């Protein structure tokens, strides 16, 4: 029933994806060879959301791995769960995109895209009732951003009524990987606004901060960052994989979280995040988890929710707890911090409870927020974009692959429109008409 197809693209997407399958397999009791060694029927009840069952009771991830160079694929294959994936589902080129969006979207990526789509079709056709696609990729590089968005638009053409959910690692303000990140990210956002249904924004700097400040790690590795992301990804899909009380399909997320079709960029958070030494000093209670998941320090993207207002939010609690207490806490949050929620959407926090906690925890919670503060991230990228584009820096790399300057201008204005839309709903109030009348009186 209700299957998902998972696609990972580029170096970043493949590394996050590989970690994600480790976490998910652990939760469903699937070992690195694909055999089931779990201890509960619940692990198998909806295992087909993410796995196909092969001969001999072997579980194979419904995952498609793509990249324009073989390097990352090889390391995934050599990793702990490398033998889990179906060999036909590795699709890679040899040239690499060289951090160039145009190469991923128009030249190198376009040559490889048909073989990726064949695998996507094969996986989609073997589903009973496909509910959608999830894609992990980054927006700053070439493959994940350029080819990732190309794939998203192709899937959109072929499966227009299926949900498209992306986990996108956005360029972070201080941790920069390449100089052309602002170009790649802006061109990608231009595509994601039109073709994706839900975009979970992540970024390395915010993840580093969580590792330093909250988890007290002295030198966090990418493995640690990916682990954080996967904890949240696993939490978001919990209600699809285990019996729960709300949000059991991806479409319901969209319905509950997106008030206007273009505003589908979410912040995600996870709790409990405690450093190894201080776990015994904290109680895992619903109020504690609620307080921690709304904490600005727990957000996995570099935007501060205190600088904006929440349009909507969803919280997925896991573990044995009373639903009544969860509902009370949600009301409590809205009443105490009412200025941080727009007043023209009543009860804008949705909560769901799933009885099965993640490995090694009694209870946990994952948070998805649609906050107007996400515009900070777009503004930052947009400023860097404008600074470079004004001088036409590095443009020849893109025009050389057949792109037009017009596309850059369009992407820039689309991003700026997005920022001003968020700002408009942040400032908007429920009694706008009444307020204008008073202002006019005062003017006279």
From Swiss-Prot:
Residues binding Mg(2+), per UniProt: 69
Signal sequence, start to end: none
InterPro entries: Beta-tubulin_BS, Beta_tubulin, Tub_FtsZ_C, Tubulin, Tubulin/FtsZ-like_C, Tubulin/FtsZ_2-layer-sand-dom, Tubulin/FtsZ_GTPase_sf, Tubulin_C
GO cellular component: a single term: microtubule
Keyword flag rRNA processing: no
PROSITE patterns: TUBULIN, TUBULIN_B_AUTOREG
Role: Tubulin is the major constituent of microtubules, a cylinder consisting of laterally associated linear protofilaments composed of alpha- and beta-tubulin heterodimers. Microtubules grow by the addition of GTP-tubulin dimers to the microtubule end, where a stabilizing cap forms. Below the cap, tubulin dimers are in GDP-bound state, owing to GTPase activity of alpha-tubulin.
Entry's family note: Belongs to the tubulin family.
Protein name stated in the entry: Tubulin beta chain
């Amino acid at each position: 029933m209700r299957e998902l197809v998972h696609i990972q693209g580029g170096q970043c997407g493949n590394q996050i994806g590989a970690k994600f399958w480790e976490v998910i397999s652990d939760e469903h009791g699937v070992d690195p060879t694909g055999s089931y060694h779990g201890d509960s029927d619940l692990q198998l009840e909806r295992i087909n959301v993410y796995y196909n069952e092969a001969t001999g009771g072997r579980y194979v991830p419904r995952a498609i791995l793509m990249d324009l160079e073989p390097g990352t694929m090889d390391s995934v294959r050599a990793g702990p769960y490398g033998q889990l994936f179906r060999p036909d589902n590795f699709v890679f080129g040899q040239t690499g995109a060289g951090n160039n969006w145009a190469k991923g979207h128009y030249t190198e990526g376009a040559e490889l895209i048909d073989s990726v789509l064949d695998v996507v079709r094969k996986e989609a056709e073997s589903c009973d009732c496909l509910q959608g696609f999830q894609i992990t990729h980054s927006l700053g590089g070439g493959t994940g951003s350029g080819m990732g968005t190309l794939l998203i638009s192709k899937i959109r053409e072929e499966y227009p009524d299926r949900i498209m959910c992306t986990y996108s690692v956005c360029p972070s303000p201080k941790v920069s990987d390449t100089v052309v990140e602002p170009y790649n990210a802006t061109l990608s956002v231009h595509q994601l606004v039109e073709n994706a249904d839900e975009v979970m924004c992540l970024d390395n700097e915010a993840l580093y901060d969580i590792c330093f400040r909250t988890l007290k790690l002295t030198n966090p590795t990418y493995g640690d960052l990916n682990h954080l992301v996967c904890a949240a990804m696993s939490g978001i899909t919990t209600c699809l994989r285990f019996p729960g009380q709300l949000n059991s399909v991806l479409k319901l997320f969209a319905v509950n979280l997106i008030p206007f079709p273009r505003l589908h960029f979410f912040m995600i958070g996870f709790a409990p995040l405690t450093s190894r030494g201080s776990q015994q000093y904290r109680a895992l209670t619903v109020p504690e988890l609620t307080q921690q998941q709304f904490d600005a320090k727990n957000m996995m993207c570099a935007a501060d929710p205190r600088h904006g207002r929440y349009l909507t939010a969803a919280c997925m609690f896991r573990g044995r707890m009373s639903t009544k207490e969860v509902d009370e806490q949600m009301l409590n949050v809205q009443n105490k911090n009412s200025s941080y929620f727009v007043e023209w959407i009543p009860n804008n926090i949705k909560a769901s409870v799933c009885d099965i906690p993640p490995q090694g925890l009694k209870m946990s919670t994952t948070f998805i927020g649609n906050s107007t503060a996400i515009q900070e991230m777009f503004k930052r990228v947009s400023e860097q974009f404008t600074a470079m584009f004004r001088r036409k820096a590095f443009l020849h790399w893109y025009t050389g692959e057949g792109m037009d300057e017009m596309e850059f201008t369009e992407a820039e204005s689309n991003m700026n429109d997005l920022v001003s839309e968020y700002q408009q709903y942040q400032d908007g109030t429920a009694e706008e008409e009444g307020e204008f009348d008073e202002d006019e009186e005062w003017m006279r």
